Amino acid sequence: MEEPFKDSALELEQAKLAIYAMGLDTTFMVEWNNYYIVEEDILLCKDSINLTSTRQYHATYYVDNYQTITVGVDNTIAQSTNWREATKEAIDVYNKYTGLRFVYNEYNPQIKISKSNLYNAIACAQGEFPLSGKPGSKIIINDSFYKNIDTFLSLSQKKFLLVHELGHNLGLRHTNGLGEGDGGVGLVQIPGTPTSDSQSFMNSTTCGNSWNGASTYDVVALKTLWPKCIISF
C-alpha cells in the first residue's frame, strides 16, 4: 500500500512561496521523498522549509567559515569509477580558495556522495542546500541520466560536476539564476562579481562540462564568502 500524500495543496503552495523568497526558481519544482527539487539539481529538505521562515533561512544560508567538512563517496560506488579521485580533486578547489577545510573521509562523512536512479530528473546530479551553518549532507549522482554515467563522464567532467554540487552544499546558487525573491532576501549578488559569468562553475545546465579551473569571479566569490584567515604581526 502506498504511503498517503502528506502535503496539502496549501502546504505545497506555502513551500513554493518560501523557496521563491530564497531567490530560487520554482517553475518546475517537484517533490522527491523528503525533499523539494528546484532548478533541476538543488535539493531542499522539506522540514527545513516548513520549520524555518524565509528570513531565518536566509540568515543561516551559507555554511560558517573556518570549519572542517568531511566528504566521502558511498561504498556502493565501485572503486573503478574514479568518482573518489574526482571528489578529492573537487574538494581541493575549495581548500585552495576558502577558509573552509575539506577532508576526504568515507566513514560517516558530513557530505555523502551516492548514486540513485532519479527518474524524470534532467540533471546529472543534485546537491542539498545547507541549514543552520552546516553543509547540505547529500550529493546524489543521477544514475539514470545517461545509460552509464560512470563511463560517459570523464574524470575532468566528474570534477566539474562535483565542484558545482559541492557549491550547492555550501549555499551557492546558480550564477545564471532567474532573479531575486520577495523582500530582497533572495538571490544575493556577491560583492565584486558581475551579474553573469559564462565561465562560472555554478552556472546551471553545465553537466558534461570539463574542468578548466575556477573563473576569476568564482574565486572572488569564494574568497568573499569564506576568506582565509591571514595572521599578521
Language-model region placement:
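Disordered inhibitory propeptide/activation segment of secreted metzincin zinc metalloprotease zymogens
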Residues: 2-82, 188-193
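Acidic helix-start/capping segments at beta-turn-to-alpha-helix junctions
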Residues: 70-75, 105-121
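A short alpha-helix/helix-coil micro-patch that ends at or immediately precedes a cysteine
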Residues: 71, 78-103, 225
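Second-shell loop/turn segments in exported
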Residues: 72-83, 146-153, 157, 206-211
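Catalytic zinc-binding patch centered on the HExxH motif and its immediate surroundings
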Residues: 83, 114-140
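Surface-exposed patches in mature extracellular/periplasmic domains of secreted proteins
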Residues: 97-110, 174-181, 232-233
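The catalytic-center signature of Zn2+-dependent metalloproteases
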Residues: 155-156, 161-217
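Short, low-complexity, Pro/Ser/Thr/Gly-rich segments in the mature regions of secreted, periplasmic
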Residues: 213-233
